[in-house]
Amino acid sequence: MESRENQYCWPKAEAVYPDRPGRSYVLKRLRYRLRAFLHRGLIAQFEQFINQHPFLVKLLNEHADYSYPLVYRFLDKRFNSKKRFQAICENLLFLPEKLTALSAPIYKTPLSFGEVIPDFEMTLSMTTHQPMEGYWVLELWHKPRNELVYLLTFAKLDEALLISVVQGPNFEGSKEMVKQLTKTGHGLRPAYLMVETMKALTKALGFKTLLGIPQKYQNKSRFIQSSHYVVDYDAIFAESGGQLKDYWALPLELSLIHISEPT
């Protein structure tokens, strides 16, 4: 019989929502159990799929929250359970399979693209944020303070890549940092820097189509803990040259239209 370490089983509610000092997650665990019960057939298929890939067994056993999107939401609020299953399975595999030449697997070690502008480093890695928004993320770090400034989460959707999240900071002094970043980037605002970087990555990975999630179908992010900070995805994608159909279709040519004088 295989040991539990070498086998994946759907995680228990306590693994996804453990109680913390001063906080109880009883209701969240109840919702989790109900959703799991309603999707028990899908969960059985998912367990079978994961157990065919040893590295995914270890990965999902270490990250209990990576499984939850299967029975809740993943990428697009319109996805039904079948589409979530297909998209999750595909996205867990596609980037590790694309980047087999790396010395360390992308799901273990972030890939650094170096300083895209002085003091700011861009990395590609597996998410440590909300997996329902996608498993893969570009992150912009302020190196002197080792502080995450911006992120862009993306996923494979059929034969395209899909931007599902573009988020900025909400820590003390973040507004000044964004101004500094815009000034250092010769007027290129950080949100658009992330989109332009994603365009380049799309081509580097061999894809010909880059899409953006329409605002009303985007899963709510938790990176910014503020009800007063609203990211206008439709405006970002429109100003990046996107055309709205089912998704925003973005051109892969790099653009300079986002250059502006920081105020």
What is each stretch, according to the model?
Residues 1-180:
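Non-catalytic substrate-recognition and accessory regions of acyl/acetyltransferase enzymes
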Residues 2, 80, 226-230, 260:
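Short, structured coil/loop segments at alpha-helix boundaries
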Residues 59-60, 73, 192-193, 202-208, ...:
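Noncatalytic linker/hinge segments flanking ATPase motor cores
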Residues 148-151, 155-242:
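Acyl-donor binding region in acyl/amide transferases
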Residues 213-216, 243-255:
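Acidic carboxylate-rich catalytic motifs and surrounding loops in phosphoryl-/glycosyl-chemistry enzymes
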Residues 255-263:
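Residue-level detector of conserved catalytic or cofactor/ligand-binding positions
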